[in-house]
Swiss-Prot record:
Protein name listed in UniProt: Putative HTH-type transcriptional regulatory protein STK_12680
Organism field: Sulfurisphaera tokodaii (strain DSM 16993 / JCM 10545 / NBRC 100140 / 7) (Sulfolobus tokodaii)
Entry-linked SUPFAM superfamilies: lambda repressor-like DNA-binding domains (SSF47413)
Keywords: DNA-binding, Transcription, Transcription regulation
Record-annotated HTH cro/C1-type domain positions: 123-175
InterPro entries, A to Z: Arc_TR_HTH, Cro/C1-type_HTH, Lambda_DNA-bd_dom_sf
DNA-binding region: 134-153
Amino acid sequence: MVTIDEVAEILSKRSLEYSMINYPDKKEKSIDIIAVNRNKKMIVKILGNKKSSKIKSDLKNIARIGLGIPVIIEDSTEQEIINDRGNILGMNVETFERILDGEKVFLYKTRGGIFVKINSKELKKKREEMGLSLGEVAQALGVSRISIYDYEREDSYVSIDIAEKLVELFGDDILGDVLSGFKVDEKDINLETQTASLSDKIMLNLNEKGYKVVKMNFTAVDIIASKNDKKLLFSVEADNVSKSLRKFNEAKKITSKIKASLIVVVKESKNKKIYEKEDFNTISENEIMNYEFD
């Protein structure tokens, strides 16, 4: 099983910008590394052969709010194939390295089988350069004219058989990249505000102000909010000052890589000045419901 340090070494060898997230340490955490590669922010978790639906929930929330591409590095995945792990991209370390080196990965494995991503713009460009009609291409592939129209309208996933025929006609430039344009459906965002916890109060306030809000469970950030281009990350004070400072510093690593603002939420008002001396932007629990986040 590949380790966090080994993945960090892979990134270092390529002189890529990254941060290792070291909070929490006594239980599973959802983010091991945040890396920036060719303007793509990758939120990385090394799982090996382990499975954790709770960790995956955190990763999906990060993607839903638009902070980066959620990646799980695992041992079981085949090389040069990306697995659909419920709107998270699962891959082995060799495939991860290929992506870092600028290679496109076009094979995507779901429960329905293995599919190939097609670059719609390149497909249309090649077809028009060759002077072929939609009908002629459809006949060559044994599909409907509407199918070819759909392939050209937006990037699509097709069967391996169809992909091979497309490559025979137009060359491998028409193959797409699974990471390109990756996004998670926002309709699954759940505020989870059944209780009146501190985090729930913050989320309610943000939601009323028009923010998209998600709750995190296994990292240094407790809440992530997004509105237009504005992104806010909230880290709630832990059990003691020492643990809180470590948590806040790890949260700062996350915000620095995804260009967001960090807000520290203080439970004990007597500690507010301590955190402010460390240059953290703080709000107290009593200020939450009336705080203007805009």
